[in-house]
Amino acid sequence: RRSSSAASDVYKRQTLNISVSIEQELSEISDENELKEFLFEMGMESTGLEKLIKTGYELLGLCTYFTSGPKETRAWTITNSTFAPEAAGKIHTDFKKGFIRAETVSYSEVISAGGWLKAKELGNVRSEGKDYLVKDGDIMNFLFSS
């Protein structure tokens, strides 16, 4: 069995301490404000599960972008350094083949503006081409020809 010392060094540095009993208690809190208060009292910024997911994504070199339409909003997992056409191809191969551009805005800008349409009105939605590297948290609308 071969092992990469670089890979093992990364795994040695990444350790998470997660209390199962605290996570169980957190999972039973349905009120968002109560959850925030509990985390604050425990001196935690986020749940252990959230930390585990974030660390896993970082170690695997993954990020998430979103698409949203009238029927659903969906998260898509891609590798870091993915160009817009390849990200579009995760949805459907026709999106990649006929890629024209992607209307793109960050999640934080959409939240600050109060929605996609407001972000667009404020000029926060960018038109990105084939050389755009998708960033974690991007919300994208792909324009393509069939």
Model-derived regions: residue spans:
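Single conserved hydrophobic/aromatic residue that forms the stacking wall/gate
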Residues: 1-7, 11
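Short Gly/charged-rich anion-binding patches and loops
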Residues: 6, 34, 83
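Generic structural signal for well-ordered, non-membrane alpha-helical segments
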Residues: 11, 49, 81-84
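Conserved beta-strand/loop subsegment of P-loop NTPase cores
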Residues: 13-18
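Nucleotide-binding motor/catalytic cores of P-loop/tubulin-like NTPases across gene-expression machines
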Residues: 20-28, 72-141
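Anionic-ligand-binding alpha/beta catalytic cores of soluble enzymes and soluble regulatory domains
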Residues: 20-72
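Short, surface-exposed secondary-structure boundary micro-motifs
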Residues: 144-145
